[in-house]
Amino acid sequence: AKQEIMFYATQAREAYPYYQHERIGYNYRMSNICAGIGRGQMTVADAHVAHHKHTCDLYRELLKDVKGITLHENPSGRFDSNYWLNTIVLDPLLRVKGQENAYQATVQGAVGGAGGVTHVAVNAHTDCEPNANVEAMRMGLDAMGIESRPLWKPMHKQPVYKNCPAYVNGVSESLFKVGLCLPSGPYVTDRDIEYIVGGIRGLIER
């Protein structure tokens, strides 16, 4: 019973390398203490944003000559992203080592450092999932101790919402298939980023 309660209180995620919801869950975990800590964090918000922007700049510099990988950018000078999360997209034709083994087994537990309780997946595949090269990149980075994760699965493709109306144009599905989130937190160092990009480069088949 406790596990089931925690399952619903920690987003009700199934055991896939991306967010897969077959039941509606919640995120009921903030206490007054956590709220107080959040207020305290506002005093370092500017420093964190500056760090995130620096992190993106370094990813951009180190990935600029890697064919088949694109780092997200501001669409124009009218935008000023805080880059709280850095994401890349992989060209579907990019070959990644081990992609023939992607989705050969179900995931055990949460992925990418996420907490909470997950249900055991019945099948490694769903009707909407990242491309094999994206999953291979995630798995390869994980083997190096690097946490990464696919982009968020579109809400209208979550089983729990399958009977709900949706107005779509295909963009969210196409991005989900090719996108990968990279470590971007305030404690990610320049050396960490160099290691991460080295891992990405090493996983690409030449």
Tell me the role of every PLM-derived stretch.
Residues 2-206:
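PLP-dependent aminotransferase class I/II
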